[in-house]
A protein has these predicted regions:
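Acidic/histidine-rich alpha-helical segments that form the ligand environment
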Residues: 11-35, 90-154
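DHp/HisKA dimerization-phosphoacceptor four-helix bundle of two-component histidine kinases
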Residues: 20, 47-54, 124-127, 154-161
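Acidic, metal/ion-handling microdomains and their immediate structural contexts
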Residues: 6-7, 17-52, 56-57
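Conserved alpha-helical segments that form or flank metal/cofactor-binding pockets of metalloenzymes
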Residues: 39-97, 160-174
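A detector of long soluble domains/segments in diverse envelope-associated and cytosolic proteins
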Residues: 15-19, 33-35, 158-179
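Membrane-interacting alpha-helical segments
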Residues: 1-12, 61-80, 101-119, 171-179
Length: 179
């Protein structure tokens, strides 16, 4: 069920910022999916990018004065992302060899183009997700309508799940250690 809301100028500005963040996340995930060497990482980036597209649609609805219902289940795809992170160390070693070989191939080709490693792509997206999640955390307290706050809180939780999926992937590949 969709309800209508009248937004303040400040709320509109905050949503415009969120819209820009979501658009940038969509672009980054799309680009990084193409740049990633590991198929598992490509899948994480693809799934996260699809969720970012949903977030953008939700933000656009809010900007048009419509508050969408947030009772649809979206945790299934996030749970499958998290489980993708737990692959064997044999695959992890193979992915590192492929990544190292890609870097060597890039260096020996004589081109000056930069080829980001999967770790660099993950690190950048993890920082991006941390930032975007924190902006939602701040924005939530600036909205007077409880339903809008609930929608923004829902998006923030999904942003945290994106970061969790990237973290789990990085940890499973030996790219990140929380200790």
């Amino acid at each position: 069920m969709i309800t209508n809301v009248t937004l303040t100028t400040k709320e509109k500005f905050l949503l415009e910022d969120a819209k820009t963040h979501e658009e940038n996340c969509i672009k980054k995930y799309s680009n990084y999916e193409q740049l990633a060497c590991d198929a598992q990482l490509k899948a994480v980036f693809r799934a996260n990018g699809q969720k970012e597209q949903e977030h953008l649609q939700t933000i656009n609805q809010l900007l048009s004065g419509q508050v969408p219902s947030m009772n649809q289940g979206s945790q299934g795809s996030q749970n499958s992302q998290s489980s993708q992170g737990g692959q064997s160390s044999k695959q992890s070693g193979h992915a590192r060899v492929q990544s190292q070989q890609a870097s060597i191939d890039q260096q020996s080709s004589g081109t000056s183009a930069f080829k980001a490693s999967d770790k660099e792509l993950c690190t950048d997206m993890l920082m991006t997700e941390k930032y975007v999640s924190s902006t939602y955390n701040t924005a939530i307290f600036e909205f007077k309508d409880t339903q809008v706050r609930d929608v923004l809180n829902h998006i923030q939780k999904e942003e945290q799940k994106h970061g969790e999926a990237i973290f789990a992937y990085m940890q499973s590949k030996g790219m990140y250690s929380p200790s």
